[in-house]
A protein has these predicted regions:
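Sec/Tat signal peptide C-region and signal peptidase I cleavage site
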Residues: 18-22
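A cross-family detector of function-defining hotspots
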Residues: 46-91
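A short, surface-exposed interaction/processing loop segment used at functional sites
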Residues: 99-118
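Amphipathic alpha-helical segments
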Residues: 34-51
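Bacterial N-terminal signal peptides that target proteins for export
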Residues: 1-8
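Low-complexity, intrinsically disordered Gly/Pro/Thr-rich segments
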Residues: 90-100
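Short N-terminal segments immediately surrounding and downstream of signal-peptide cleavage
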Residues: 23-39
Length: 118
């Protein structure tokens, strides 16, 4: 009985230690936004860009955005150019996914509460 009670207490402590996740449907973010609009809304809502590793920014859309000061970009696929941007607010993470090949044309495709691999 004592062992079971300790296990439950340990489970509660471990669950409580998990980082919180971003709201799946923030009212200030929608799929009709351009990346610039979404980024502005994200920063206004108190999120901070998670700076990515500079060594991975030597080509295409990633390089162009990184040189424009968008340091939170982590990667873009080739072809339709889906790009990932990461933000943090306290213990929460927000991953913004865009589609497009140039900054003015980048549109919000989706978002998740994923944190980048660290």
């Amino acid at each position: 009985m004592i062992l079971a009670a300790r296990s439950i207490c340990l489970a509660v402590v471990l669950i409580g230690a998990q980082p919180a996740i971003a709201s799946d449907n923030p009212s200030w973010l929608n799929k009709q936004m351009t990346f610039k609009q979404a980024r502005r809304a994200i920063l206004r809502a108190g999120w901070q860009p998670i700076r990515s590793d500079d060594r991975d920014h030597d080509y295409g859309v990633v390089s162009a955005l990184h040189h424009k000061g968008v340091k939170e970009i982590t990667q873009c696929s080739e072809g339709e150019s889906f790009c990932n941007f990461y933000y943090r607010k306290q213990n929460e993470c927000l991953r913004l996914i865009t589609i497009g090949e140039q900054l003015p044309a980048l549109k919000v495709y989706d978002w998740t509460s994923e944190c980048p691999d660290e």
